[in-house]
Every structure is written in structure tokens, then in C-alpha cells.
């Protein structure tokens, strides 16, 4: 698993005098963050601690040492042991956490992470990509990604980020209501987008998506619902009814289909994330 970690922040080289005080005191790494200490010169002492600050183990590291990753939330501190110390610290995470940790973006959608475990890198269209959280992740994994959104600022942010990360993502301003996909794709992704589309255009949009998915290709849709038992709490322009999305894809093979409660990142007046029902579907074209 350590092979899958990626560095999202590299600290400068520290000497004995520049070693930050916080690292010399009891502290821990964040959830989902691994620390990688590298000694370039001299010696440093590494203390493994309990939450109460009791020493569990001590290690002396030099440039020749094989230094393991500091696990997430592990309590520790360091101490310079030589005047000529030069060291640095890198912060690592899993690929699915990289963009949220580095750029403070919304987390990759969990269903995209799951889909990427079973769908090999291929030609992908991220329909309604927003700032590109899913697009950037899929591109990082080696997918050939095209990303469309109607929001200029979102596309500009994605373009800026892909340049910084040297990722090859094709972007465009696009109104999904136009239902005008013209190329074929192996995988079309649309997460938390349908609720902003025009109700009367949805049949054409889905038909257009299906027609431009290669045989054996996939559609992933996560979309808001409104049902008799759980009416949608927000005035979205479109919500799926019970089994409505399933009916559109009745001729496809379902790898996943559920209609479950979920949460938006948006919060109510009390600061709680808004709960509602979502249709989640990963289907393969026969």
C-alpha cells in the first residue's frame, strides 16, 4: 500500500537551528497523512510516543538509515543529535486524497474511487465536472479524461490545476441540457449534477449519454431523488423518482444500483450536512 502513497507537501531542508519547535514536541500526523522523514546530514532522534507523551520506542536516524513512514495519527517527536543536522519532511497520502489535501478541494466522490477499482484506464467523459475533483483523480490514475462544465470559473480552476500537476485533461464549456455529446467514450461519469438540469431535457440527455458509450463501456450516475417517503428538501430543478433511473438503463447490466440516503456537502442553518435520497448507478452497456 505504501507504493500507492503520493507526496502532497514537501517541507524545506531544516538545520538543527531551523528545526521547527512543534516537531520537537509531541504531535501527530493528520488522518490520511503519512510523514516521511529524510536525513541528509548528521543525526536525529525519533521518539514514538503514546497520546499521553510516554516514550514507546526511540530511533536514531542518519543519511544511511531506512526510515519508515510515520503512520497517520501516530504520536511522535524528534530531537537533533548533531550540530550539522540537515533533514526534511514530506507529507504523503493516498491518491484519492491528494487533491483535497493539496488544494483543499472537495473529496473525490466515493463511487468514482470504487468504480476506478474495477474499470481499467480508458476514455472518460466527466459530465458536469465542477472544479474537476473526479477528473483530476482519474487523470492521475492514467485515464484519458475529457471534462465538461457550464461554469467558466470551474473550468478555469481545473485548467490551472491540471497545468500545475502536468496532467493531460481535455476541458470545455458545455451545457449538458444540449444533449450534444458527439464522440464515443468508454466511461461517462456524472456525479451530483442531474439535479441542476432541465427536467424536460433529461430523457434526451440520458439517451445521448447511452448512445455515445461504447459497447462494454460504463455510465456512473449519482443523482438526487424525491420520493413519497423522502421528499427532496431542496428546490432542485430535477430529481429522480423511485426506480426512474433504473428504468432508463433497463437494457444495461447493473454493477451497482441503489437508492439510499446520503448527504450533500451543503449544510443547513444549524451547520449540519443536508440529508436526502440519492440514486447511485454503475451500469455496463451490453
Swiss-Prot record:
What UniProt keywords are attached to this protein's entry? Answer: Methyltransferase, S-adenosyl-L-methionine, Transferase, Virulence
Q: Which Gene Ontology BP annotations are present?
A: methylation; response to tellurium ion
User: Would the keyword Protein transport turn up in this protein's UniProt record?
Assistant: no
Q: What happens when the gene is disrupted?
A: Deletion of tehB leads to an increase in sensitivity both to tellurite and to the oxidizing agents cumene hydroperoxide, tert-butyl hydroperoxide and hydrogen peroxide. The tehB mutant additionally shows a significantly reduced ability to utilize free heme as well as several heme-containing moieties including heme-human serum albumin, hemoglobin and hemoglobin-haptoglobin, to support aerobic growth. Virulence of the mutant strain is reduced compared to the wild-type strain in the infant rat.
- Inducing factors: Transcription of tehB is independent of both tellurite exposure and oxidative stress.
Protein's UniProt keywords contain Transferase: yes
Binding of S-adenosyl-L-methionine, residues = 128, 133, 149, 175-176, 191
- Which GO MF terms are attached to this record? S-adenosylmethionine-dependent methyltransferase activity
UniProt record similarity statement:
Belongs to the TehB family.
- What name goes with this protein? Probable S-adenosyl-L-methionine-dependent methyltransferase TehB
From what organism does this protein derive? Haemophilus influenzae (strain 10810)
Amino acid at each position: 500500500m505504501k507504493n500507492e502513497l503520493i507526496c502532497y507537501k514537501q517541507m524545506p531542508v531544516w538545520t538543527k537551528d531551523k528545526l521547527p519547535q512543534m516537531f520537537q514536541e509531541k504531535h501527530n500526523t493528520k488522518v490520511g497523512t503519512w510523514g516521511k522523514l529524510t536525513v541528509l546530514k548528521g543525526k536525529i532522534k525519533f521518539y514514538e510516543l503514546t497520546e499521553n507523551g510516554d516514550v514507546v520506542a526511540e530511533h536514531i536516524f542518519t543519511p544511511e538509515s531506512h526510515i519508515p513512514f510515520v503512520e497517520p495519527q501516530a504520536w511522535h517527536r524528534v530531537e537533533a543529535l548533531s550540530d550539522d543536522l540537515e533533514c526534511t519532511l514530506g507529507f504523503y497520502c493516498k491518491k484519492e486524497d491528494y487533491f483535497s489535501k493539496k488544494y483543499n478541494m472537495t473529496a473525490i466522490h466515493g463511487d468514482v474511487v470504487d468504480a476506478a477499482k474495477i474499470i481499467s484506464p480508458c476514455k472518460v467523459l466527466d459530465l458536469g465536472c465542477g472544479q474537476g475533483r473526479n477528473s483530476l483523480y482519474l487523470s492521475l490514475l492514467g485515464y484519458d479524461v475529457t471534462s465538461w462544465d457550464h461554469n467558466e470559473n470551474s473550468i478555469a480552476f481545473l485548467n490551472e490545476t491540471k497545468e500545475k500537476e502536468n496532467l493531460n485533461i481535455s476541458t470545455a464549456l458545455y451545457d449538458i441540457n444540449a444533449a450534444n455529446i458527439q464522440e464515443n467514450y468508454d466511461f461517462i461519469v456524472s456525479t451530483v449534477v442531474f439535479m441542476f438540469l432541465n427536467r424536460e431535457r433529461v430523457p434526451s440527455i440520458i439517451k445521448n449519454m447511452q448512445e455515445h458509450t461504447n459497447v462494454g463501456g460504463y455510465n456512473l450516475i449519482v443523482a438526487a431523488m424525491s420520493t413519497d417517503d423522502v421528499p427532496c428538501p431542496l428546490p432542485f430543478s430535477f430529481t429522480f423518482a423511485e426506480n426512474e433511473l433504473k428504468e432508463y438503463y433497463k437494457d444495461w447490466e447493473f454493477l451497482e444500483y441503489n437508492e439510499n440516503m446520503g448527504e450533500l456537502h451543503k449544510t443547513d442553518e444549524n451547520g449540519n450536512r443536508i440529508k436526502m435520497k440519492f440514486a447511485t448507478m454503475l451500469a455496463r452497456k451490453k
